[in-house]
């Protein structure tokens, strides 16, 4: 019995070697492993991997085929002897001052070897499903492997050590905290109401997390972040541009945004962050910030990631941006059914001195086109008396008439229309419409008619007749 107690005392140093938790005294024949951070898991499973065995030099032995996983991870040929060497190595890993009994050899343990072994253990059959995600009840001393699954997260296989207390063979309780990394990829845009104008430069942010990749996976240690965009062009260089890939705890850039050949997406290679099987970066947040220039009336953007052969973010909702549309109806004589074609306007945004410029599309609409060479400020009503402009941001806009249709006068009042968001965030393109009446030209006094001509002719006739009578009477007198 003394020998056994000595062995058990030595094994107490194994506590915490494999992420073992705080222990407390339990009932003689049972112990509780308290679980922290597992409550949201879809499934929690556990299995004993080291058990008491007085026939072994350490007093412990691997259980449920876990020994082969450890010897393989430690680079040893599997046998009872090599398994004992691994167990003694685990003891010394925790306490370098432990003195080994004569004739005992310990295989050096490292964090990488332990993680590799546990990743192999996780693939074994024989795990039991925990009915309670906050605690597990066990009735034997030893080391227990605990694994979990949760949509949107990867879990590192955890271990808990249930030891012996006083009086022997009282079992001690244990506690273990989950170590998990989100696989989610979150996308946001700086424009809070999600309404922009064509030509605007908008800033996007992607947040993702370095995944935990099993140490056993040495061939496919990959991690990339991807992005797809429609309705805008990536704007990574130039005034007010942003292109940044950072990781928490590190000042320098950890990656570069590489735009695809078609310009509709990009990829960021972050393989270097997961190359180490020790997973030192697992769970650290990656922040990608970049700018894009709006070119269409709607913009759709979606991010994802790829880690160890698995794609994440496929179910993410894309981030959408919208623009506004204004429609003006030009009519005459107070009758909205009397639409007027060929009226000309310019459009001003409230607070700006220069009129906005547009390009006319094949569908007859005018698309906002700032700083575009072939754009024009002139807007002309179509055969239906309509002007339809799109690609505008929220705000008030004023239509100023510059040329009235033939036979009508300019309405100097113009028309002001406003684009507003219904709620905090737009869910569709904004729209507003209004009409503007023109009146016919007023009648002016006629010119170029007979006027006084008839009177002039009559007067001249009278004068000629009078002159004739005068000369006739003179001639008569002379006779």
Question: Which residue stretches match the model-derived regions?
Answer:
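Solvent-exposed loop/turn and edge beta-strand elements of beta-rich ligand-binding domains
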Residues: 2-479
């Amino acid at each position: 019995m003394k020998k056994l107690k000595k062995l058990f005392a030595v094994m107490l140093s194994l506590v915490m070697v494999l992420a073992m938790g705080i222990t407390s005294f339990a009932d003689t024949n049972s112990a509780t492993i308290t679980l922290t951070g597992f409550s949201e898991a879809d499934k929690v499973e556990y299995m004993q991997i080291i058990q008491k065995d007085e026939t072994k030099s350490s007093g412990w032995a691997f259980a449920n085929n876990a020994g082969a996983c450890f010897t393989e991870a430690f680079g040893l040929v599997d046998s009872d002897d090599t398994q004992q060497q691994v167990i003694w190595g685990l003891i010394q890993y925790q306490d370098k001052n432990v003195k080994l009994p004569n004739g005992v050899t310990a295989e050096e343990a490292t964090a990488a070897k332990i993680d590799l072994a546990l990743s192999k253990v996780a693939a074994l059959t024989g795990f039991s499903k925990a009915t309670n995600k906050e605690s597990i009840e066990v009735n034997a001393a030893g080391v227990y492997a605990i694994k979990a699954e949760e949509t949107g997260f990867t879990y590192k296989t955890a271990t808990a050590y249930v030891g012996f207390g006083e009086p022997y063979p009282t079992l001690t309780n244990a506690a273990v905290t989950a170590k998990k990394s989100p696989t989610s990829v979150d996308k946001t845009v700086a424009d809070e109401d999600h309404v922009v104008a064509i030509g605007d430069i908008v800033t996007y942010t992607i947040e993702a997390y370095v995944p935990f990749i099993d140490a056993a996976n040495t061939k496919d240690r990959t991690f990339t972040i991807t992005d797809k965009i429609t309705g805008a062009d990536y704007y990574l260089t130039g005034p007010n541009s942003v292109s940044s890939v950072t990781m928490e705890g590190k000042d320098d850039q950890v990656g570069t945004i590489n735009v695809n050949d078609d310009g509709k997406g990009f990829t960021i290679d972050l393989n270097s962050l997961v190359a180490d099987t020790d997973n030192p970066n697992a769970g650290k947040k990656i922040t990608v910030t970049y700018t894009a220039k709006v070119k269409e009336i709607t913009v759709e953007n979606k991010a994802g990631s790829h880690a160890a052969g698995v794609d994440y973010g496929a179910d993410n909702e894309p981030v959408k941006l919208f623009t506004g549309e204004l429609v003006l109806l030009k009519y005459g004589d107070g009758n909205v059914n009397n639409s007027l074609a060929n009226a000309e306007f310019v459009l001003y945004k409230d607070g700006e001195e220069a009129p906005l410029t547009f390009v006319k599309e094949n569908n007859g609409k005018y698309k906002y086109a700032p700083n575009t060479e072939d754009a024009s400020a002139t807007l002309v009503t179509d055969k239906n008396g309509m002007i339809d402009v799109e690609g505008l941001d929220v705000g008030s806009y004023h239509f100023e008439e510059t040329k009235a249709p033939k036979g009508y006068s300019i309405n100097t009042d113009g028309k002001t229309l406003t684009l507003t968001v219904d709620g905090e965030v737009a869910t569709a393109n904004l729209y507003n419409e209004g009409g503007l009446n023109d009146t016919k030209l007023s009648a002016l006094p006629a010119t170029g008619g007979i006027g006084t001509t008839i009177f002039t002719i009559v007067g001249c006739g009278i004068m000629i007749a009078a002159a004739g009578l005068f000369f006739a009477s003179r001639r008569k007198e002379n006779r």
